[in-house]
Each structure stands twice: as C-alpha cells, then as structure tokens.
Amino acid sequence: MSRYTGPSWKRSRRLGISLSGTGKEIARRNYAPGQHGPNSRGRLSEYGQQLHEKQKLRWMYGLNERQFRTLFTRAGKIREGEHGTNFMILLERRLDSIVYRLGLATTREQARQLVNHGHITVDGKRVDIPSYEVSVGQTIGLKEKSKNLQQVKDALDAVTARPSFVSFDDNKMEGTLVRLPERDEMEPEIDESLVVEWYNKLL
C-alpha cells in the first residue's frame, strides 16, 4: 500500500486532529469534509475506533501500511516496556521525526522532504533516508549550504519549545537525541492501545 499523498487538510478534518501539527486545518473547519461533513461524525463501533486510531497514527507520521506494520512488529519484540509505547518510541526515532522535533521543519512532511533532498546529516554524514533510526547520542544537523535555506530559518524562528529528549545548539544549528522519549512526551491525541488491539486481531 502506497503512502497517502492526497489533500492533508481534508485528511486532518476527517480524523478530527491536525496532522500537520500547525492546527490550522482544524481551526478553520472543525468537521469532516464533504456535503454532510458537519453532521458526519457519529459514534464509531469498536472496529471503527481501532481503525480510526490506526489511520490517525499512521498518517500523523506519514508512513505507508507496510512500513507501519513492520515497525509495529519490531516493537512487539522489544522485551521491556509496553508494546504500544515501544511502537511510539520507534516512530519518534525516525530521522524525519527527530528533524521535526528539533524544529528544523514546521511539519513532519517538511522534515521528510529535507531528508529526502539530502539536506540532513547524522554525525556529520549526509543521510537521505527518512526512516533511518536515530540512536541516543547521535547528532542531527544540516549540510553547510542547507543552513541558509529560508524554510529552515523560518522553522527555527517559529520554535517556542522543544521536547526534553532532544537538545539543540542554535549556533551550530544541530541537535542531539539525548534519551528515548517518555510516553507523555509523545503525541497525546493518540490512544496506542487501540492500534495494538487492531493489529492483534490481524497478526
């Protein structure tokens, strides 16, 4: 299954959350798209709730179904911690997500583009794979020429706070994953237990 590339605002309104992280799409129209949008959000069945939560999390991080399920399976093999929390941690450790958390991009989609276009370095070496798994202690930065990108400057100017599991050096324009995130530092809108329930029925 390919990654969804349709209108992100419609997708956000359908799910009822801001997938971009900006909140603009929900602030403008806080109901699902379509002719019956304002009245279309009824009570979901248990199946519907699980599917809704799975799609919400998958689209939030911009993964296709195969990538998403692979990470979920990996998380289940980690002996310590809860399956759902470990899954969330693996999602957060993706390079595109860390770039977003550092404030080098305003959305995960923009962060993914920065990685794909070769602007991002890990420990000084260019890495253009958004799914690259960042380890604690690794330093994420920009290629020297990329430090002048206006979109990066705008993103950094818009930063008001960063999660405490990353640190950032404003002078060097680089940051570090200092530790793994705690559950309360990750997406609060997600109930990952519903995602676990969904896949437990399938796998």
From Swiss-Prot:
Annotated disulfide bonds: none
Single biological process term from Gene Ontology: translation
InterPro entries with a match to the protein in the record: Ribosomal_uS4 (IPR022801), Ribosomal_uS4_bac-type (IPR005709), Ribosomal_uS4_CS (IPR018079), Ribosomal_uS4_N (IPR001912), S4_RNA-bd (IPR002942), S4_RNA-bd_sf (IPR036986)
Residue ranges of coiled coil: none
Entry keywords, A to Z: Ribonucleoprotein, Ribosomal protein, RNA-binding, rRNA-binding
Top-level taxon in the UniProt lineage: Bacteria
A family per Pfam: Ribosomal_S4
Residues in S4 RNA-binding domain copies: 93-153
SUPFAM superfamilies: Alpha-L RNA-binding motif
GO-annotated molecular function: rRNA binding; structural constituent of ribosome
GO CC terms in record: small ribosomal subunit
Function: One of the primary rRNA binding proteins, it binds directly to 16S rRNA where it nucleates assembly of the body of the 30S subunit. With S5 and S12 plays an important role in translational accuracy.
HAMAP family hit by this protein: Ribosomal_uS4_B
Stated family: Belongs to the universal ribosomal protein uS4 family.
Subunit structure: Part of the 30S ribosomal subunit. Contacts protein S5. The interaction surface between S4 and S5 is involved in control of translational fidelity.
Name of the featured protein: Small ribosomal subunit protein uS4
Lineage: Bacteria, Bacillati, Bacillota, Bacilli, Lactobacillales
